[in-house]
Amino acid sequence: MRKFVANLLAVLFATCVVAAPRPKNVILVIGDGMGPSHVTAARWIRGDKLQFLRMPVTGLVATFSADDAVTDSAASASAYATGMKTNNRALSVDANGNPRKTVLEVANESGKATGVITTTDFWDATPAAFLSHSKDRYDDARSIVQQIVSGKADVVLGGGSDLLGKGSFPSLAELKKSDRVVVTSRAELEATKARRVLGVFNTQPNDTEDPDAPLWVLTKWAIGKLSADPDGFFLLIENEGIDTASHNHHSDDVAKALTEYDEALRVVLDFAAARRDTLVIAVGDHETGGLDICCEGGEDKGWRMEWSTPDHTGAAIPLFAFGPGSQSFAGYIDNTDVGKKLLSFVRK
């Protein structure tokens, strides 16, 4: 009898696992450099409007790379993109330099629409890890740009217009010779009906959002376009300003970038809550600045940001999840686990 009950429970458990809903759409929202104290700061800044409060599943993510206890953005984004560790500076290749398929590439193979949005140069480490392959992000910039422009992502939106045509970077005129429609303003973006779009906007100080093309606006536009695909979509959204401002210890711009991130996340969660077929993951890629939140003291009980380093740290980072499949991200996991789960959800 005991054996029968055990077997029955095993069958029931297996049935539940198989029957667990799979997301049609997957949206990964990365706050570059966003560690535990950044999340604490965001709670003070946003109060009850903080979008993480809408996400019932939480986790903690280990971030070390293949060759260092402290990752850089290239290696950490590659772990999310491929489910494998790589060396710092490398983009979606293994530790031996062999290219590995990214979640965006697998989503394309599965017939899904795909897109990437960032507040920094569109070929920077995090977007590039999902869109290209390179042994060294710093020695291969022109190739990375060419891979992104000729790649299969339907939508690529980011900064970098000020660098085009300088050094090894192609000019805007060269980019316009590709099969993509290239836009450089919000008005041009909202007017285009093209299937393949490259938006190149102005990169701002500390990589905060372009006021002409705020991150939440780009997010709303991209979701509207990609969600028309009957097979679903994969979308990466990154706010780079959290990282850059943390490197520079510019607390005001950190607060600004956290607000921008939260406003974009609001757009994502509003979409996901209405649809109930969309997995949303909100997470950093590593911690930057050794941030701590300290009390000002006095009657106002204020707070301030204090910094211990201009560099990245090895701190584990918070993860928040919403939607079908979100429970699989609970607990203490590795950044490669995030990538493996994302890959499993976009495969046919």
Question: What do these predicted regions represent?
Answer:
Residues P36, T259-G298:
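Metal-dependent active-site segment of extracytoplasmic phospho-/sulfohydrolases and closely related
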Residues A10-A19:
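Hydrophobic h-region of N-terminal signal peptides that target proteins for export
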Residues A125-L131, T203-N206, A222-I223, S227-V267:
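Active-site His/acidic residue clusters
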Residues L28, L157, G199-F201, F234-E238, ...:
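Structural motif
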Residues M1-L8:
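Bacterial N-terminal signal peptides that target proteins for export
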Residues A20-G165, S171-L189, R195, E287-K348:
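N-terminal catalytic scaffold of extracellular/periplasmic and nuclease hydrolases
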Residues V183, D212-S227:
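A Trp-anchored, charged/polar loop motif used as the substrate-binding/catalytic surface
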Residues R137, P211-T219, A257-Y261, V338:
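Phosphate/oxyanion-binding active-site loops and adjacent basic polyanion-contact surfaces
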